[in-house]
Amino acid sequence: MSAEASGPAAAAAPSLEAPKPSGLEPGPAAYGLKPLTPNSKYVKLNVGGSLHYTTLRTLTGQDTMLKAMFSGRVEVLTDAGGWVLIDRSGRHFGTILNYLRDGSVPLPESTRELGELLGEARYYLVQGLIEDCQLALQQKRETLSPLCLIPMVTSPREEQQLLASTSKPVVKLLHNRSNNKYSYTSTSDDNLLKNIELFDKLALRFHGRLLFLKDVLGDEICCWSFYGQGRKIAEVCCTSIVYATEKKQTKVEFPEARIFEETLNILIYETPRGPDPALLEATGGAAGAGGAGRGEDEENREHRVRRIHVRRHITHDERPHGQQIVFKD
């Protein structure tokens, strides 16, 4: 006799199937983000930790990426505090906002900062600012060297201040045609212009390494002076008096080779510690005396100025008895 089970059905056994994965990342709600209030006129922006509070009108006034974000084309989410998060450096975002608000901004002087601002302008698609940054960078690249500025000495005090304020060697040209008491020789005007032209050429070539000064108020007619570490090292005077048969004349020379030599010699004073004594000796410097004479007169030799004068023509009757003509001391 078979017995048939009766009663309520047995409880269903637990399912052995694994739960199906949803395949979706956690939604914005999981991070506490919510849509931007559609009717709001103001927006709070958190750009890489830099906080900004601005209006929708500013953000949507120009055709940029920010206009695409806040004109309703895409959904913009905010955090619990109502801040819109933008994962970007906020260093130049204030400049971006100012450009969107005003249409122009002062650009940074640094080439590096200009490049950074250009990168941000490209990211936010601010076309006008992109063009301004590119133009500024191009102008900086075209400026190959700094301006060649030549101070004009107006007083001995100003000259001393200029010499004390620079660490560069100094080349000074004094030219003052009004100092002449006599007529000039036929070649003097031409030679004076040659001295001025050579000074300008040297200034254009060496203005990055030397300070060039012009003096138009001094007592000489044409004289070059060379300074190193605040003191005069050499001097080349280009004028002399020619005694003709019946009248005196002023003669201006153009000792081009000597001027070039002294200009190159003064370059050894570029280093703060001064020139090497062996180098001074090789170039005929003031400290370049022989080893036997490097005793008690060493300091005097180091501070002696090389003065080179052009030949001075003197008649026999006007030369005092026993006077010798000295061309270099």
UniProtKB/Swiss-Prot annotation:
GO terms for cellular component: Cul3-RING ubiquitin ligase complex; cytosol; nuclear body; nucleoplasm. Substrate-specific adapter of a BCR (BTB-CUL3-RBX1) E3 ubiquitin-protein ligase complex required for synaptic transmission. The BCR(KCTD13) E3 ubiquitin ligase complex mediates the ubiquitination of RHOA, leading to its degradation by the proteasome Degradation of RHOA regulates the actin cytoskeleton and promotes synaptic transmission. Keywords: Autism, Autism spectrum disorder, Disease variant, Nucleus, Schizophrenia, Ubl conjugation pathway. It comes from the Eukaryota. It is linked to The gene represented in this entry may act as a disease modifier for autism and schizophrenia associated with recurrent deletions and duplications of chromosome 16p11.2 region. PANTHER family: BTB/POZ DOMAIN-CONTAINING ADAPTER FOR CUL3-MEDIATED RHOA DEGRADATION PROTEIN FAMILY MEMBER (PTHR11145), BTB_POZ DOMAIN-CONTAINING ADAPTER FOR CUL3-MEDIATED RHOA DEGRADATION PROTEIN 1 (PTHR11145:SF18). It is found in: Nucleus. Belongs to the BACURD family. Residues 1-31, 282-303 are annotated as: Disordered. Residues 41-109 form the BTB domain. It holds the Pfam family BTB_2. Disulfide bonds: none annotated. PROSITE patterns: BTB. Expressed in a wide variety of tissues. Changing D200N: Found in a patient with schizophrenia; uncertain significance. Induction: By TNF and IL6/interleukin-6. Residues 1-22 have a biased composition (Low complexity). One of its GO terms (molecular function) is identical protein binding. Pathway: Protein modification; protein ubiquitination. One of its GO terms (biological process) is proteasome-mediated ubiquitin-dependent protein catabolic process. Homotetramer; forms a two-fold symmetric tetramer in solution. Interacts with CUL3; interaction is direct and forms a 5:5 heterodecamer. Component of the BCR(KCTD13) E3 ubiquitin ligase complex, at least composed of CUL3, KCTD13/BACURD1 and RBX1. Interacts with RHOA; with a preference for RhoA-GDP. Interacts with POLD2 and PCNA. Interacts with SPRTN. This is BTB/POZ domain-containing adapter for CUL3-mediated RhoA degradation protein 1. Gene3D superfamilies: Potassium Channel Kv1.1, Chain A. InterPro entries: BACURD1-3, BTB/POZ_dom, SKP1/BTB/POZ_sf, T1-type_BTB.
